[in-house]
C-alpha cells in the first residue's frame, strides 16, 4: 500500500497514475483509491462544502472525510490479502492535516485514527511544494473561478503544510514516511518514488 500525500497541486494524482503504469508494466495487480471519493454520498457532501453550497463545521468535516475512507476499509484489506498493490491518492493523513488546520484538535484527530484501525501503508510519500506553487498549479489546472475554498486560501494551506510536516516528523502511524521535493521534474519525482519502493 503506497500513499501519496501533499497539499493541493502537489502532483499526487499525476504520480499515482505514473506509478500505476510502472506497477502494471512490472506485472503487478493494482488497485487505485483517491480521497475524497466524489462518487460516494460522503464525497458529494464534501464537494458541496468545498464549493460553498453547504456549510459544515470542522467536526462534521473531519468525520465526513473519515467515513469516506472507512467505507473502503474492507475492500482495501481484501485487496491487500489478495496480493494487489494499492496506490492511494490521499489517506487519513490529509484529513488530520486539513482539519487540524481548520481548528480540529490535532491530538484528538490522531487518537481517533488509531481507534479506527485502517490499514498501515507500506510507504507514505509526502510531496512537498510551496503554497505559492500549489495555488499557481491549481489556477492553471482549473481556472481562477473554479478553485475550491481550500485551494484558494494561502494562509490555510500554509497551516496544512505545517501539520503535514508534523505528521512526517512524528512518523505518525508508520515509520515509512518519505519527503519528496514536488517542484522537481515529474519523471524525476516518479523515479525517486519507484527507487524508494524497490519495485522489481
Q: PLM features: what roles do these ranges have?
A:
Residues 20, 132-200:
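NTP-dependent small-molecule kinase module
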